[in-house]
Amino acid sequence: MFKEVFSYRSHVAALVRLLVLSLILTQIPLFNYLGYEFSAAVALCWSFMAGLLTISLWKKSGQGQQPGTKQFIYRSLILGLVPLFIPFLIICLNAFFVKNCSFLGGSILFLLIVLPAVLFSQALAFFLAVWIRRWEKTAFFLSWFIVLFHILYVTFTGAQIFAFNPLLGYFAGLTYDESLEVADRLLLYRMGTLAFTLLMVMAAQYLHERHWPGEGAIQTPPGSSRRGIIFALSIVVALLFFFSNDLGLSSSESHIKKTLGGQAETEHFVISYPDTLLKGARLAQIVQLHEFYYVQLSRALRVRTTRKIHTFLYASAEQKGRLIGAAGTNLAKPWLWQLHINIGDIDASLKHELVHVFAADFGFPLIRVGINSGLIEGLAVAVERIEYEEPVHRLAALVVQNKLAPDVEGLFSLTGFMKAPAGASYVVAGSFCRYLIDRYGMRRFKMLYRTGEFTILYGKPLPMLVREWRRFLGGFYFNGGDRAKAEYLFKRRSIFGKECARVIANVNKESRELLAQRRYEEALVSTDRSLEHSMSVDAAFQKTTALLRLGRYTEAVKFAESNLADSARAASFLTLRVLLGDAFWALDSVESALKVHAEILRTHLSVSWDEALSLRLEILLRPDLARTLKPYYVSLNEDSARVALLERIVRAEPDEPVTMFLLARERIAHEKFDEAIQLLDAVPAMKSPILELARQRRLGQLSLALGRYERAKVYFWQSLNHVYRDSQALEIEERLKFCEWMTTAGEQVN
């Protein structure tokens, strides 16, 4: 039977195509090992070919002129499934050249994605061959693409960006999230796929039986048994369809609203939010922040929206990932007038995502977005003007001067932006778009956003405009700390350049959760498992943290120093030095700890990092205080013990500003804002300008959170006296404007 099935020239040609496809995939990063991407590519290509071959086999074997179908089904299964050994064996052999981090996990995905896709496609072809009898391949071609089009339909017309599909299995959406944990839901969905596949086969058999009503036409169970099987299969399909929201196989807008629970409405927005998390003043401020940015963006982009924008706020990345996908990526769907944001990212992401929706007014028709991702994301960053707490032009100059910039012209092609590392791409595109807007005006840029025609609109080709922009950036000058910061932020590979990216991301996520649960021994085992696959920044940081929390300080020092000694990756491990400094501190090597922390501080990674490092330096410069607070930083793992230590010190030394500052931070972490304000107000002016800025900013933020807007303005005004970066002044001035907005607009939530 094998020889007969593969004796046709078209069948042999299909096997050759499958072989060539498999070999090509071994040369493409991310597709070159047994994982999701490889399985998805094989599923799409071979399911299409297997369907056409099934129709060909039906016609060439003269099956339409014979009564039975059992032999044909067996031969079809051989034709569709046996060739799958080709890609499976090739990708397994490729493991000798490309690391395969999880053979078992990859095999499970291959089984769940590829096999059901091929069986579904063959059943569809079988049904069409029996039912239509003419133009069968054309009908299959159209039907196959309609089924695949379901992915676009679901992700384009609904809130979710993921989709379960009979042919692809699972589509994760266009997102920067590397973690992919879908096997349990995919298994459930594939049960439905196989049930529907069997229903199509039985329907085809029934149609063929009607054509050949004679004895022995079909070897299937008796009528009552067949009806029972059909009923059972139909129940499976129906249950998965009607309960798909609850099972995590889909997520309708109504289901998302119901899950979140809360809804507020303003003149320009409908805001769905987690009612268990957002209440009172915080809810009112988030609602008004929408209107505050609406006014800003209306002026900046010269646009007024024609309908209300719907914002969905999620309690956590996990909730967002479960409901729409893209757990760690905030996103906008301009064509639906929707934003999807994790509540913890609202201050950092709301304005950026709103720009995408506003830009829909002058975007490409129907989909209402820019002509390419470089213009889409570049405009959003250009309007914000700040990225990584730096003015966007300064940061872009830093990227360019350190030769870390991606191909700038390529960023404005159809796919170039997605291929490049995300961090540098956003900065470079944002700076370039800001330059075009400032130099040539918003009106011309809005036309560019829709068309992508640089030469027509600016009278200059893109390469010439890029050279102009590079000359503009030439006026910035940087020190060694700036260069170290640039290498840390941007000397990173995209997902296509990483080994076993998804497997490692899943393991690192597990390690992060174990650390949060203070299960340090288990976290250490998990990080070692990740590091066995490949060295990554996250895993190295997590392992060092686990070693510190377990009191294994010497091991922590050796591990951190071994990674920092490698010049090729030392820049990426910059923040690992903080843990190295803490480990030195734990070993009473105060001088080494001071040196390490001071070295990181000169990079000024962010306001929060500057605050954390300045506090450490203040403490380490005072031996008595360093001994007293050492347990707080390196050995006390329980929050209650850490707080108790600080409270004892504050009672014993009520005039010690550092411990009062630390205790205030603990009060903030436990949402005891009034107590935190009392402590910070009682702290005398800090000698360090970084810490004094942090104190005043925190007082302003706390007063704002409590709805004390006039008082918040005072603190923010005072903090302007201590800024040491241009971006800090811009951020504080934005807070001042929002306080003024809240004072005049009030806290009205419909």
Q: Model-found features: residue ranges?
A:
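Hydrophobic alpha-helical transmembrane segments
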Residues: 1-58
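Membrane-interfacial interhelical loops
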Residues: 30-39, 86-110, 141-192
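Secretory targeting signals
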Residues: 34, 75-135
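Helix-loop-helix units of permease transmembrane domains in multi-pass membrane transporters
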Residues: 35-82, 89
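Juxtacatalytic substrate-recognition/specificity segment
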Residues: 36-42, 254-372, 383-391, 398-408, ...
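Beta/coil-rich, acidic/histidine-enriched accessory regions frequently appended to metallopeptidases
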Residues: 150-194, 211, 224, 231-244, ...
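Cytosolic-side transmembrane helix boundary signature
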Residues: 193-230
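Hydrophobic alpha-helical transmembrane segments in integral membrane proteins
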Residues: 235-259
